[in-house]
């Protein structure tokens, strides 16, 4: 990995930091990858896994879906200000008729925990029927709360409506295949060999620990719980291609995707729209913990307010760094200032609400300093 722009000592420190959690028995395995100048310069697997092992990306999947939407905007098939109901008629029910595509991408659309679930998510008609039932928690555009899965089911249905193809196929045909990345979404049973099964790591934070760090004695309720997380081990869940979190692949695939975003590889995106999506903040609203969202159109930007670590990007990246992490410690970002992209994946889902984000901050902070 000889490259005059890399810092060998920092790379060594990064690998040692990632190795420590596996050696200490906190995680069963992990992968990490660094991209630079359009290539993968570090591809490391640690623990009970192979270099070919694939991991669940969880919400690090979301930018792949957004990347399709960017193309559709450039092609004139959709507009960011289009109401979702103009594509999905059923969506207009219960006061949702004016919610725009942009609001859905920014997580300000007002249905953060609207249910979908295995009983209805396998085909378009049942998904649309479920969307008709969804109700609003607030007036769209007035508040920000992360939508773990609901928003991207809507984006997936828009993709299907305007292309005539399933969202998982469109992600592969438009994004991953042109980049030489294996299919990540909608994997048939015969395509699932070599995926690391997820396991829960014991040891939740106590109420006193939570209060000392976050100022609350319990974390806000979320649909992302142990049961829903472990469901991503199921063959059927892997097959359906959950658009907000059901991508599977290697850390190197994630790092390569972000290199493609940095360099607009193969001219996959309109340059001005790519800049608008990944380089501009469109959502400044605070999250429920009081941290400004700093969201672009499908990614999170680090920002210059000293809160980049609260957004999952560590403490040492530039304000223009952007990415999107996934539950359980998945990390994926790039930094236009240095040209680095970084990804970290693990199948050990640390349930400790303080240890896990601190691990992420430590790893991301080290990674961002590996390129001089």
What annotation goes with each model-predicted range?
Residues 63-68, 150-157, 252-256:
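Short amphipathic alpha-helical face segments that pack within enzyme cores
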Residues 2-45, 56, 61, 143, ...:
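Catalytic loop of the DD-peptidase/beta-lactamase superfamily, centered on the K-T-G motif
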Residues 118-121, 129-133, 137-139, 144-146, ...:
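Recognition helices and adjacent regulatory flanks at domain boundaries
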Residues 90-98, 143-148, 247:
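A glycine-rich, coil/turn loop motif that links secondary-structure elements
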Residues 50-51, 135-141, 151-153, 234-243:
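Flexible glycine/proline-enriched surface loops and loop-helix/loop-strand junctions
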Residues 84, 97, 147-151, 273, ...:
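Short, conserved alpha-helical segments within structured domains
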Residues 51, 59-60, 64, 72-116, ...:
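Active-site helix/loop module of the DD-peptidase/beta-lactamase fold
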